[in-house]
């Protein structure tokens, strides 16, 4: 069972951050969770190296950030009637946010998928969001869509790891207030072309594919049988194909409010780059909906 009592949301006062704030406020109200809003501003030395502006401009940025943060806290309290705390931290955004997560220990971290810089084309994934996912063990919700209403449809992309699959489905159903949760298991028969080149018969290849489907079905059935579903409808989908394309096709087909994907952990030395180039990254980058990345 997912316990969601503390939520942290990052803000840079951009439109994308406003989407993230609204979603976080809705989730905090739904789960009766406390909410911590964090804004990162550059220290003076970093600001002066990156800009020709002087200290007086830096002071203006600081004052604007403090006022903007107060306004965002007031918006959250007024709109969602929740308990909210806010703070400004100095330093690079990703580093400040990771430090805040380490100290506050939220059950969920939320960030706008784009950040303050305009993306060249949708859907895109901002650098701070990417670094945050790579450098923390906290589930991270990437918000792309505006809206104050609760999620009513979700898609959990699972694989052969039953423990991870259960975790993803638990998160998907926890963030839904009610509605449909699509559980997608993409499977494939490895090395089909090599098998054909070696003269393996189509009947044998088909038998391998059926065995892969059976394994996927057993995994999904096992996960769904142990899922608490009050007010949610679970739908299992077995899709034969390469995981990235298969999952993105299912997202396009069912148009969920939220996609939930797993991030398998590597060795500690890989932390800074372990998310780069992975299946999870590519799905998170291309999915045109909110995406929750679960470690």
State where each predicted segment sits.
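Short, structured interface segments
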Residues: 127-146
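Short, well-ordered secondary-structure micro-motifs
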Residues: 48, 121-122, 167, 193-197, ...
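Glycine-rich, Arg-bearing micro-motifs that act as flexible, cationic patches
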Residues: 111-131, 151, 258-285
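Small/aliphatic-rich secondary-structure junction motif
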Residues: 1-55, 153-204, 286
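A short acidic, glycine-rich active-site loop
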Residues: 55-67, 203-215, 269
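Structural beta-alpha unit
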Residues: 1-3, 23, 56-60, 74-109, ...
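Short, flexible loop segments at boundaries between secondary-structure elements
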Residues: 140, 280-295
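General small-molecule cofactor/ligand-binding pocket signal
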Residues: 36-38, 85-89, 141, 182-184, ...
């Amino acid at each position: 069972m997912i316990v969601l009592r503390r939520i942290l949301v990052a803000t840079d006062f951009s439109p994308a951050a406003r989407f993230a704030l609204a979603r976080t406020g809705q989730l905090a109200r739904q789960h009766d969770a406390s909410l911590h809003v964090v804004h990162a501003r550059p220290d003076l030395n970093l600001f002066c190296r990156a800009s020709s502006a002087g200290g007086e401009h830096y002071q203006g940025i600081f004052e604007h950030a403090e006022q903007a943060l107060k306004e965002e806290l007031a918006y959250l309290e007024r709109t969602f009637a929740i308990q909210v705390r806010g703070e400004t931290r100095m330093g690079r955004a990703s580093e400040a946010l990771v430090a805040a997560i380490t100290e506050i220990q939220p059950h969920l971290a939320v960030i706008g998928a784009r950040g303050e810089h305009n993306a060249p084309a949708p859907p895109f994934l901002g650098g701070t969001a990417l670094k945050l996912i790579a450098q923390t063990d906290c589930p991270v919700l990437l918000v792309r869509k505006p809206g104050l209403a609760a999620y009513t449809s979700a898609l959990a992309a699972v694989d052969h790891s039953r423990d991870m699959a259960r975790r993803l489905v638990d998160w998907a159903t926890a963030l839904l207030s009610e509605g449909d949760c699509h559980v997608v298991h993409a499977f494939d028969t490895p090395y089909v072309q090599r098998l054909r080149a070696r003269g393996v018969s189509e009947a044998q290849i088909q038998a391998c594919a059926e065995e892969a489907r059976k394994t996927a079905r057993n995994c999904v059935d096992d996960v769904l049988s142990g899922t608490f579903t009050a007010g949610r409808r679970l739908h299992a989908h077995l899709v034969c194909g390469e995981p990235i394309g298969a999952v993105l096709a299912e997202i396009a087909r069912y148009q969920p409010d939220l996609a939930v994907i797993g991030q398998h952990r590597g060795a500690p030395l890989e932390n800074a780059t372990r998310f780069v180039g992975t299946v999870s990254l590519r799905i998170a980058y291309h999915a045109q909906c909110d995406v929750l990345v679960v470690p």
